[in-house]
Structure formats: structure tokens, C-alpha cells
């Protein structure tokens, strides 16, 4: 029997980038599995002046620290600019990307090829979430919360609490 775990040398450091607006149970599933493959996983929150996230950067970082930051070998960070430059600065040899469905693949594949062109020393590793999270996205979670739905099955408790406050009806 072939033991696959011994066939792959442990890469030292990987980056799992995203906007995490907000972090979902699907994100946490990818983080949990990625941390078993690498010595360190840096969960990197992208700061993009062109986008208007629901949650400010500091709040996204705080929620990630509360939910994933306590995991062994996981570090929460932020970055602005090119991901491969951040990876180079952090001496990371891999970028982790989650693929929920075939529809994610085309975009992620193009990004992986572009990142390889920019820096051939950074590999992209695709991980699929557990089946129960394949439909889950931050966008869908925000829409459910905005419409008054219960998101507690899709996000950690701290995130559900934050979203319920964010979308609470105002009593004017």
C-alpha cells in the first residue's frame, strides 16, 4: 500500500489569501486542513481600496484571530498589493485556494498561472472543502443575514453575532 503522506515533503509555509468578508465555516475547513499540510499557514486578509467590504479590515482580522488564530501553526495577517510579493516577503512557498465547484476553477486556474508567471517559486495548492460547505460563500451568507435569516449554521458564533448586529433593524 502506498502511503501518500510520505510522498509529499512538508512545505514550510503557505498563505491562504482572501477577503474573508466574513469568514465562514468553509474557510475554517480549508484552514484546518491546510495547517495539517504545512508547518505554518498564514491566513492573509486582502486590503483592496477598490472594493467596499461589509466589514472593515480590522473587524475581519479580529474575527479571524478569534476563530482561526488560536489554531496551532496558523497566523493571521493582512496584505495589500500583489499576492506573490507578499508570499515572497513571508518566504511562503505555496498559496492555498479553495475550490467549491467547477465554476471556481477557471478563475482560480488563471490566477494560479499568472502567479506562477510572476514568481515560479510560489506554487498554488487547490483544496476542496467538505461537501457540506461546497455551496457556501461569504456573499450568500451576507445576503441571508441582510434578509434577516439565521446564519449560525454557516459561520462561527462570533461572526453570526457580528452580522446580526450589522443587520439589526434600526428603531428610529
Could you describe each region identified by the protein language model?
Residues 2-172:
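Nucleotidyltransferase catalytic core that binds NTPs
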Amino acid at each position: 500500500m502506498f502511503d501518500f503522506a510520505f510522498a509529499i515533503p512538508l512545505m514550510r509555509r503557505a498563505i491562504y489569501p482572501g477577503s474573508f468578508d466574513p469568514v465562514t465555516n468553509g474557510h475554517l475547513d480549508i484552514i484546518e486542513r491546510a495547517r495539517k499540510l504545512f508547518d505554518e499557514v498564514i491566513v492573509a486578509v486582502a486590503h483592496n481600496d477598490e472594493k467596499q467590504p461589509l466589514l472593515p479590515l480590522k473587524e475581519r482580522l479580529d474575527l479571524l484571530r478569534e476563530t482561526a488564530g488560536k489554531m496551532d501553526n496558523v497566523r493571521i495577517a493582512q496584505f495589500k498589493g500583489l499576492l506573490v510579493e507578499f508570499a515572497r516577503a513571508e518566504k511562503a512557498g505555496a498559496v492555498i485556494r479553495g475550490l467549491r465547484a467547477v465554476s471556481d476553477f477557471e478563475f482560480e486556474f488563471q490566477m494560479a498561472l499568472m502567479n506562477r508567471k510572476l514568481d515560479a517559486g510560489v506554487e498554488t495548492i487547490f483544496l476542496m472543502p467538505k461537501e457540506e460547505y461546497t455551496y457556501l460563500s461569504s456573499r450568500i451568507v451576507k445576503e441571508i443575514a441582510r434578509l434577516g435569516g439565521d446564519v449560525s449554521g454557516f459561520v462561527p458564533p462570533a461572526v453570526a453575532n457580528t452580522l446580526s448586529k450589522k443587520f439589526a433593524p434600526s428603531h428610529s
